[in-house]
């Protein structure tokens, strides 16, 4: 004989089977219970700051606008360019580091960077990169 649904479901306000009672317990005071400790101060909620993603995007965009002012770039193409710049940077930095340790020095100088660029980039591209780099270093030292 089936039971009626009213008898099987718990009554409103009664605790469920296996869960603690909702009545005032020593841990949790009732409505008028005052908490011990500092007089009613609220705990400040600390928001987690979003981690900043570093990229060469703004610089790639500036160069694009210098070369082709009327051309845009998609986010996928920007991602590819960013990966390319990171790759070239890592290659040059790694080679410059090896050159520095081979010369038994502890500081990477512009000379090691220049040699690394000459070793990594082919022919005419290396010459242009070295001349542009020298120009940039000269501009930086004169502005200081």
UniProtKB/Swiss-Prot annotation:
Motif SPKK motif 4, residue numbers: 19-22
GO CC field: nucleosome; nucleus
Modified how: Monoubiquitination of Lys-139 gives a specific tag for epigenetic transcriptional activation and is also prerequisite for histone H3 'Lys-4' and 'Lys-79' methylation.
Region (Disordered): 1-51
An example molecular function term from Gene Ontology annotations: structural constituent of chromatin
Keyword Nucleotide-binding carried by entry: no
Phosphoserine sites (modified residues): 14, 19, 25
Compositional bias segments (type: Basic residues): 24-51
Intracellular or extracellular location(s): Nucleus; Chromosome
Motif (SPKK motif 3): 14-17
Motif window: SPKK motif 2: 9-12
Positions of short motif SPKK motif 5: 25-28
Known glycosylation sites: 131
Pfam families: Histone
Cross-link annotation Glycyl lysine isopeptide (Lys-Gly) (interchain with G-Cter in ubiquitin), location: 139
InterPro entries assigned: Histone-fold, Histone_H2A/H2B/H3, Histone_H2B, HISTONE_H2B_site
Motif stretch (SPKK motif 1): 4-7
Source domain of life: Eukaryota
Entry comment, domain topic: Contains 5 SPKK motifs which may interact with the minor groove of A/T-rich DNA sites. Phosphorylation of this motif may regulate DNA binding. This motif is reiterated in both termini of histone H1 and in the C-terminus of plant H2A, but its presence in the N-terminus seems to be unique to sea urchin histones H2B.
Annotated function: Core component of nucleosome. Nucleosomes wrap and compact DNA into chromatin, limiting DNA accessibility to the cellular machineries which require DNA as a template. Histones thereby play a central role in transcription regulation, DNA repair, DNA replication and chromosomal stability. DNA accessibility is regulated via a complex set of post-translational modifications of histones, also called histone code, and nucleosome remodeling.
Assembly with partners or alone: The nucleosome is a histone octamer containing two molecules each of H2A, H2B, H3 and H4 assembled in one H3-H4 heterotetramer and two H2A-H2B heterodimers. The octamer wraps approximately 147 bp of DNA.
The protein's name in its UniProt record: Histone H2B.2, sperm
